[in-house]
């Protein structure tokens, strides 16, 4: 158990029960494994490399994870579903609430179909993982969401589309066509389009404007 604003750093696998509390920090330097992990008002850095490119680090929890206002920091090359990313793999159950902070590792943004999987859960997935701050790259704004199918709803993904319900079934029993999800663009994208439109029309004048006011 690590308490009292302690800081630990590991670069080898660790097979143990680890409990962080009282603003403690665990700085992971390489792929690591623990049996159980509790993050209580503390922070875990899955990786904190200085370079722009991500070298994915994996934290494996062979049993259970508990979050109590904990924070997980991950680095992801924000792009499409196949983007390189740090990852947390939990073979057991999750509980509590954890904030997740994602740092972009040089990604330029791309549309995601299913999302970038950053947290995988095998057991009961009762824990909630909440985006700590904005996550964006290129024109896209990313959210942290559960998977939207029965096979993936225990896991957590970085997505940049609006969630839609499945195809509706009509009275004849057939399903309506599936509507493609709508991409979520950065707030700044709207301002860019508006500024571009204004720039393109700024010096477009009517004849009366060019001739001046008639006296």
Regions found by a protein language model. Name each.
Residues 1-93, 97, 103-104, 108-160:
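Extracellular beta-solenoid/beta-roll
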Residues 33, 108, 155-157, 161-184:
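Flexible, glycine-rich linker and terminal segments associated
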Residues 168-215:
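Outer membrane beta-barrel translocator domains of Type V secretion systems
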